[in-house]
Structures are given as C-alpha cells and as structure tokens.
Curated annotation (Swiss-Prot):
Pfam families: CTLH, LisH. It comes from Arabidopsis thaliana. Belongs to the GID8 family. One of its GO terms (cellular component) is nucleus. The gene is GID8. Keywords: Cytoplasm. The keyword Plastid does not apply. This is Protein GID8 homolog. It is found in: Cytoplasm.
C-alpha cells in the first residue's frame, strides 16, 4: 500500500476531528513517514529496466544490466529490431518498416488489420508528401480502397487522406495534420506497441502509470490534509504548501 493511501485511510478514520479543518502535516513528519516506507532495490531496478526496455533504450538497458545485475524481461537483441521498425516509420520509410515487422513476426500484421491499414495509410501520406499524385491514387485504389469497402472506419480514414490531393496548398487542407510529423510518431508508437504485445510484454512502461497514480493520490489527499507536495515530477522535490 502506498504512503498516500496509508495517510488517506488514517485521515478517513479521523473525520470527526477534521470536520472544520484539514490535518496539517509538517515536512519533518512527512519525511519521517517517507523514510519509514521500505522499498526493495531489486523492485526499483526492475522498474527502471522495464522503462528502458519498453522505450527501446537498448544501450542503456545493456549497461544497466551489467551494473545492477537486473535481467530484462525480453531478449535485448529484439529491442534493436523493434527500434529499427519504429525509426523507419518515423523517417517515412513505411514499406521498409512493414518488411521489418514481417521479418520479426508475420502474424503481427496478419492478426492486426487496423495496424496494417494505418501503415498503408502512412505510405499513402508519404507519397502525397513527395508530390507523387498518380502513384498515390493508384496505391489508394489498389491497396486501401478494398479495405475501405469492408470497414466503414477505414473508408472514412481513406477519404480524409485522399482529400490531401485536392488542395494545392496543404496548409489550407482541413486534414493537414495528417502531414505533420506527429502523425508519423503516432503510427510508429502503434507499431511499437503491437510488437511489444506480440512479445508478451506490456506495451506501455510502468513508470508513467505510477507517476499518474502519484498525482491522483496527492489530489485525493489534498481534500483531507495540508502536506509537502511533489509538484515537479522531473525532480521529485518536496515543496511545502507555502512555497
């Protein structure tokens, strides 16, 4: 049970005494409680390794494994392959990315039609970005239109994408965000998550979820007490309410 949850439970038991005011918790009291919480170093190391593996920091993961003795949940060699796929999408080399995914595991795209459509859609976007209008139209008709006939959501996405061809100036197009690099990143993240899932690994690192839980717990405790906060998650520094 987290420190915040312990405090919340304790404060709920003292509701009668807190009818008119919040409980004041000094920095000294708070730090004493923090220091009393026992965290295993092995658990912290596992959390760090999970983040490095999921986010694809293979060199950092290898170094951390040597220094801490923490074993990764998957073969680190697969991280390099996964990052190669992600980088290919981020660079607009979608066809290369698809080949790499199939080399890793053909079932990933065979069993995930939505992901495959999004990759093909990204290929179409890249053709439009390069000004290859005829090639883009041919690709849309041969590769994407048949999928749109089978899936209404795919058809709507295809229509939005083809709309990019109507405007000479992409900046005036209602769906210009498809040409943003952020759309490449979105597709790359989707592929990354699918590969992780195929390897029986969480698609998201645990650390961000724990930080969200921290924010939630602080919000819950705010209703019952005044205490030192962690306002900047990047530093983890405790700040008194008066600061």
């Amino acid at each position: 049970m987290s420190l915040f949850r312990i405090f919340i439970n304790q404060l709920e038991e003292d509701d009668e005494d807190m009818a008119t005011s919040k409980k004041m918790i000094t920095r000294e009291e708070w730090e004493k409680k923090l220091n009393a919480v026992k965290l295993r170093k092995e658990d912290m190391n596992t959390l760090v390794m999970n983040f490095l593996v999921t986010e694809g920091y293979v060199e950092a993961a290898e170094k951390f494994q040597r220094e801490s003795g923490t074993k990764p949940e998957i073969d680190l060699a697969t991280i390099t392959d996964r990052m190669a796929v992600k980088k290919a999408v981020q660079n607009g080399n979608v066809e290369d990315a698809i080949e790499k995914v199939n080399d890793l595991n053909p079932e990933i795209l065979d069993t995930n039609p939505e992901l495959f459509f999004h990759l093909q859609q990204q290929r179409l976007i890249e053709l439009i970005r390069q000004g290859k209008t005829e090639e883009a139209l041919e690709f849309a008709q041969e590769e994407l239109a048949p999928r749109g006939e089978e899936n209404q959501a795919f058809l709507e996405e295809l229509e939005k994408t083809v709309a990019l061809l109507v405007f000479d100036d992409a900046s005036t197009c209602p769906v210009k965000e498809l040409l943003d690099l952020s759309h490449r990143l979105k597709t790359a993240s989707e592929v990354n998550a699918a590969i992780l899932t195929s390897q029986s690994h969480e698609k998201d690192p645990k650390l961000p979820s724990l930080l969200k839980m921290l924010i939630w717990a602080q919000t819950q405790l705010d209703e019952k007490a005044v205490y030192p906060h962690i306002n900047d998650l990047s530093t983890g520094k405790l700040e008194d309410p008066s600061e």
